[in-house]
């Protein structure tokens, strides 16, 4: 089991070369690790122990009843959840049925939880896979081990010149590259919101408000409350088994089934609800931040200055005014990866070139906007 988790850690290991934001890494690293770990835990408990154990009569073999109820799903009675346990009912939702089909709440998700968690992990990694493909190793190629900063002066000078030449010759050609990353962040937001609705469908419309109901349950008077965790993840359910009797007539057998995995499922999904809400909030803030960056050159100057204090303000203003948003984004990522002193020199040299060469001015309306 430990070897599996080590392999899982390597799968979602964050590279030392930073090509994305912290919030984006929460999606493809931490969240994928959490979902895969939960999937492995449920899979282990499901296929090593007994995922379902039904109380049966001697007429029905134990393995037959357990297998049937596992495949066909079990149910509880909605009208019995507010009955007092140990007095009116033996357990919430368990008791005699009045024959109303609408009163039955079926639990069809039980055997699919491990697969669903695995599928969710794949969906969370997809934006990362897409950005990795689009990024193409550009940042890793451009930093040329300048993140270490320990090399001879001649080698350092040569690498700085190569980096500066690339930035100069490719200025104004990085917008689509940056927009592709922003699209991946947007996909991450769509994914986490979509997964909330996916889980809501998975649990028959009970997941969207699950966390709110848990909070409300904790604050409600004990006499008037219904545990939403027991309602969605019951430990004990009913199962109806039909078979032919000795006279050839169909016999109906009611069984009580224990669902031990729901003890774990309950904790997993209450955690995931709050985690997904947090991810949604952080990702939404990140996208608002991206929109501000796209439309506000002054904000780009401010953010660059706040992050890289060794770089002179006039150099930053020249670069932002004479380049496009994609160039700013590339420089920002390079600054995250390169030695601070080397990065300061590269930015200053680029600003000097731009100051002495007017032909690199951004033409048209874009240039007027970026001159603001």
UniProtKB/Swiss-Prot annotation:
Molecular function as annotated in GO: gap junction channel activity; photoreceptor activity
One GO BP annotation of this record: monoatomic ion transmembrane transport
Transmembrane regions listed in the UniProt entry: 22-42, 111-131, 183-203, 268-288
Membrane topology classification: Multi-pass membrane protein
Keyword Amino-acid biosynthesis annotated: no
Extracellular side: 43-110, 204-267
Main location (coarse class): membrane
Residues in compartment: Cytoplasmic: 1-21, 132-182, 289-372
Keywords: Behavior, Cell junction, Cell membrane, Gap junction, Ion channel, Ion transport, Membrane, Transmembrane, Transmembrane helix, Transport
Gene deletion effect: Flies fail to jump in response to a light-off stimulus. Neural-specific mutants exhibit modified giant fiber system and gustatory response.
Tissue: Isoform Neural is expressed in synapses of giant fibers (GF), in a large thoracic cell in location of postsynaptic target and optic lobe lamina and medulla. Isoform Lethal is expressed in embryonic mesodermal derivatives. During metamorphosis, both isoforms are dynamically expressed in pupal nervous system.
Domain of life of the organism encoding this protein: Eukaryota
InterPro entries reported in the protein's UniProt record: Innexin
Location(s) in or outside the cell: Cell membrane; Cell junction, Gap junction
One Pfam family in the UniProt entry: Innexin
Record's GO cellular component terms: gap junction; plasma membrane
Its biological purpose: Structural component of the gap junctions at electrical synapses in distal and mid-depth levels in the lamina. Isoform Lethal forms voltage sensitive intercellular channels through homotypic interactions.
Family: Belongs to the pannexin family.
Subunit (UniProt): Monomer (isoform Lethal).
UniProt protein name: Innexin shaking-B
